[in-house]
Every structure is written in structure tokens, then in C-alpha cells.
Design a protein with these regions (language model features):
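Membrane-proximal stem/loop segments at transmembrane-domain junctions that anchor or position
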Residues: 309-409
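Short acidic/glycine- and proline-prone juxtamembrane loop motifs at membrane-interface regions
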Residues: 210-224
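Loop-to-helix entry region of an early transmembrane alpha helix in multi-pass inner-membrane enzymes
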Residues: 144, 148, 152, 160-179, ...
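Transmembrane-helix signature of polytopic, membrane-embedded enzymes
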Residues: 184-207, 455-460
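Start-transfer (signal-anchor) and selected internal transmembrane alpha helices
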Residues: 1-103, 289-299
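Extracytoplasmic catalytic/substrate-binding loops of multi-pass membrane glycan-assembly enzymes
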Residues: 108-124, 128-164, 320-323, 360-362, ...
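Membrane-interface anchor segments at the N-terminal boundary of transmembrane helices
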Residues: 47-62, 167-168, 387-464
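Transmembrane-helix motifs of polytopic, lipid-linked glycan transferases
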Residues: 171-192, 230, 442-446
Length: 504
């Protein structure tokens, strides 16, 4: 009975993830999305999404050429397999990446803009004794009190590093990328029982221009992703050995991840589902341990949030506001093209900044959107395709956009300007467009193949599935999708490995 249930659950998840990846692969092969950021003479910034058809024959050809080269390289290096698997290569790669990242950060010195700048300004206000952002109805923290974890991090960095706090944050992001690479590698080893696959994933992550350029984005994205991946790895280790160290690390890392970025709740839920699924097939003691870890994660998240709120209230002298309800983001996500358009804030403002009244107004707005979709099904299909295209089909995932209009680099200005605005940036975007298709093809092949998969191998895939479903309703943005794209890299590596192994 238990075995039947496990087979049924695994098949359902496999079909759903494969279907989503197949859809995204088709989007990638036949179309692409670019983000244009323009600034007029008054300093106003306009962001627009441009949808274009891809040369599908060239995209398919690139996938085939990549597969052929992979087969050739695999054949040529078969005799040097031990060297490829050597951890020394990974250490060297990490050191090179660390030095390159430090050089990049200290060279370009890009200060934060947009929301990261607003969060850091709130931190500066707290240190200056100005707490208006928490009490003024138009204040940033009055609307978004869940950002207080990020604010406290900025407060700590400003207290230690002063005006160079933004550089310290970028160094933390650099270290976070290394943690992400290592955790994805270790999770891959647990899921596929292959050290060589884990090393390939590590190299693939640090070679991604997306992760490199995201180091300047001071919004907690990389730090939160590093923490939740650390939590997932610790959860897997706990199910194997039941050590209290893994219990504590998993609970604390989950709490920190959600505090820094609430979107990390999606991979956290995937991890919780894994724990519940695993305990159904284990012995009685292991069931108790797994369920205990689930409660431990919940407790850590609740206590962590309360602790952050308490510390913020202590520093600001103002109670934590209820803030803008999450329902407002859904209302905004279902209006227009689904990107940020001010609908969420307007609903909050028009309801008199009353959270309960804003929920009712947002729900009315949501029902209106759903009714319109039902009555105009052709429009809904177009809207659904375009919303997912602008999120998942920008191969740069906003890594170029987030670095634009942030002042001139202090060193290597011509190179950096060419990367962001010139032909070098266009070439990078085209390369990433091809790489994205290769990644999605490998991941799709893995999930559509009939080979038996361990329960551990489902965690990141279910997290990506959750991210896809969540952002069908939530505010759209390719920068929100970037973490899920990185979670697909292990499946891409394993998928291509399986495919090449069958073509010996």
C-alpha cells in the first residue's frame, strides 16, 4: 500500500514538473523576452518588456551541437575521469571565482538603486534617529514591514562599514554564490548518488553570468537562496542520520531565509513536503524525527519573525505595522501584464491604509480580473503566455537590467558600459538565450525520462513547480524567477549526463 502511494505521488509530481518544463522549453526555443530600461532627461525611468520570435532552427541546432560536443568531450576525457572528479579543481575554481568577484565589486562600486536603495535609506534613518518610515502612512516600512530583516542587516553593515556598507553587502552576496554552488552540488550528490555530477553542478553555477552580475543586487535574493539551500541540504542529512546539528541548522537557516526573502517560503514548503513524504516510508523513530523537524522549522520561523519585529520595534520605537496585505500583490499580479504597476499600493491608499479594508478591496479587484478572464478566454490565454514569457523567458533574468542606470563604474568604465548598453551586452544576452534552452532541455529530459528517481531528487523540482504556479498569480518579474532557474541546473546536468550515457 505504502509503495503504491509513493509511486502515485512521484508520478504526479514528475508529470507536473515535466509539463511545466516542456512548456518553458517551447517558450525558450520559439521566443524570447528582453527588458528595456530607459531614462529621460527628467530622470524618470521607464521599464518595458519586448517579446520577439526566436530563430527556432538555430536554437534547436545549438542544442544539438551542444549535445554533440558533450559526447565528444565525454569520450576524450573518459581516461582522465579521476582528474575531472578531483575536488582540487573545485577548490581552484572557487578561489578564482572569489578573486574575480572581489575585483569586480571593488572596481565597479555600483551603489544600490530602486527598492534596495530604499531599504538602505530606512537603515540610515534608523541610525539617525528618524523613524518616520514606520509611522507615516506613505512610509516604506509602513507598507512593507516584512522587509525589517533586510533593514536590520543594512543597519549592521552601516554600523560597521559606514558608507562602504553597500560594498560589504556585495561581498556577502559573493560568498552566498559560493554557498549556493556548494549546496546545489551537495544536494545533487545526495539526489543522484554521484560525486562527479555534484562537481559539474558546482562549476556550472559559478560559470553563470547571471549569478555573477546579481552580486551587486542588495535585496537579499542570493543570501536567502543560500540559506534555504543550506536548510534543504541539512534536512536531507537529518533524514539520513538524525543528528541534532542538522536539525538546528535546518531550522535556523529556514528562518533566516524567510526573514530575508519571504519568497523562500516556496522552496521551504517543498522541503516540508519531502520530510512528510519521507517519514511515511521510514521506521517509527524516523517518522517522529521528521515530524519533529517540521515543527522545529515552523517554530524557528515564528520565533525568528517575532524576534526581528521585537528588535526593529526596539530600534525604531514604533510598533510593527500590519502593512499592505499580501492580497494586494495578487490583485496586481492579475492586472495589466502582471508586473509592478502600482495597483497594490493604490488599493492600499484608497482603502485609507486600513489592512482589513484593503483585503476586501483587493479581493473585489481579483474577482473582477477573474471574471474578465472567464468572459474573454482568448485574452486570458494571451495574458498567461506573455506573463510567463516575461518572467521565465528573459535569459538574463534581469541581471543586466538591475545593473543599468546606477552611475558610471569607477574603473573599467568603457568595458562596463559596453557590457550593459553595447554590443558586448547583446552578445552576452544571445549566449544566455542559447544556454537557457540547453538548461531547460536537459532538465526536461531528466523529468520526462522513465528512470527511477530518489525522493531527495524531487525537492528542487517541486520548488520550481511551486514558483511557477505562485508567480502565475503574484507580481511578475524575471528577478523573482532567477532562484528557481538555478534550482533547475542540477536537473539539467543530470539530464544531459543520462542522455549522453545512453548514446555511448
Amino acid at each position: 500500500m505504502q509503495q503504491r502511494m509513493d509511486i502515485w505521488v512521484s508520478k504526479v509530481f514528475q508529470v507536473l514538473v515535466a509539463a511545466v518544463l516542456g512548456f518553458l522549453l517551447l517558450l525558450s526555443v520559439f521566443s524570447s523576452t528582453t527588458v528595456l530600461v530607459q531614462q529621460n532627461l527628467n530622470g524618470d525611468v521607464k521599464v518595458s518588456n519586448v517579446f520577439s520570435r526566436d530563430h527556432s532552427i538555430l536554437r534547436i541546432g545549438f542544442i544539438l551541437i551542444f549535445g554533440g560536443l558533450l559526447l565528444l568531450v565525454r569520450h576524450c576525457l573518459r581516461r582522465t575521469k579521476r582528474k575531472i572528479q578531483s575536488d582540487a579543481w573545485i577548490t581552484v575554481a572557487y578561489v578564482i571565482f572569489l578573486l574575480a568577484g572581489l575585483f569586480f565589486i571593488m572596481s565597479v562600486r555600483l551603489e544600490p538603486r530602486s527598492d534596495p536603495e530604499k531599504v538602505m535609506n530606512v537603515a540610515r534613518q534608523i541610525l539617525a534617529g528618524d523613524h518616520s518610515s514606520f509611522v507615516d502612512q506613505e512610509g516604506y516600512m509602513f507598507r512593507y514591514p516584512f522587509q525589517n530583516g533586510l533593514v536590520l542587516l543594512d543597519v549592521a553593515l552601516l554600523s560597521v562599514f559606514g558608507q562602504n556598507a553597500y560594498l560589504a553587502f556585495q561581498v556577502l552576496n559573493l560568498l552566498a554564490v559560493l554557498v549556493i554552488a556548494e549546496m546545489l552540488g551537495r544536494i545533487s550528490e545526495k539526489g543522484y548518488l554521484s560525486h562527479s555530477i555534484g562537481n559539474a553542478v558546482r562549476i556550472f553555477v559559478i560559470l553563470q553570468p547571471v549569478t555573477f552580475l546579481y552580486m551587486t543586487y542588495l535585496y537579499g535574493t542570493l543570501l536567502s537562496l543560500a540559506c534555504i539551500l543550506f536548510a534543504i541540504y541539512s534536512a536531507i542529512c537529518y533524514t539520513e542520520k538524525g543528528q541534532w546539528r542538522d536539525f538546528l541548522v535546518c531550522s535556523v537557516a529556514s528562518s533566516v531565509a524567510v526573514i530575508l526573502k519571504s519568497n523562500s517560503m516556496i522552496p521551504m514548503i517543498s522541503m516540508l513536503l519531502f520530510l512528510l513524504w519521507t517519514c511515511s516510508a521510514e521506521n517509527k523513530l524516523r517518522k517522529i524525527q521528521n515530524i519533529g523537524l517540521v515543527f522545529g522549522i515552523f517554530a524557528a520561523c515564528v520565533l525568528g519573525r517575532k524576534g526581528i519585529n521585537f528588535l526593529t520595534e526596539f530600534l525604531s520605537g514604533a510598533p510593527t505595522p500590519a502593512g499592505m496585505p499580501k492580497m494586494n500583490w495578487i490583485a496586481m499580479g492579475l492586472s495589466g501584464d502582471g508586473t509592478y504597476n502600482g495597483v497594490s499600493v493604490n488599493i492600499f491608499r484608497e482603502s485609507g491604509f486600513d489592512t482589513a479594508a484593503s483585503i476586501a478591496d483587493a479581493w473585489a479587484n481579483i474577482k473582477g480580473s477573474l471574471k474578465y478572464f472567464w468572459e474573454h478566454k482568448g485574452y486570458f490565454i494571451k495574458w498567461f503566455l506573455e506573463k510567463n514569457a516575461l518572467q521565465w523567458n528573459d535569459p538574463s533574468f534581469g541581471c543586466i537590467q538591475i545593473n543599468r542606470l546606477r552611475g558610471d563604474a569607477y574603473w573599467g568604465n568603457c568595458f562596463f558600459q559596453e557590457l550593459l548598453y553595447g554590443q558586448l551586452g547583446n552578445g552576452l544576452w544571445r549566449l544566455l538565450n542559447n544556454v537557457q534552452s540547453v538548461v531547460l532541455f536537459g532538465a526536461f529530459y531528466y523529468w520526462s525520462s522513465r528512470g527511477q528517481k530518489t525522493k531527495k531528487a524531487y525537492i528542487l523540482g517541486v520548488a520550481a513547480l511551486g514558483g511557477f504556479l505562485f508567480h502565475c498569480f503574484w507580481e511578475a518579474g524575471s528577478q523573482y524567477i532567477m532562484p528557481y532557474y538555478l534550482m533547475l541546473l542540477p536537473y539539467a546536468v543530470e539530464g544531459w549526463h543520462v542522455l549522453c550515457s545512453r548514446r555511448k
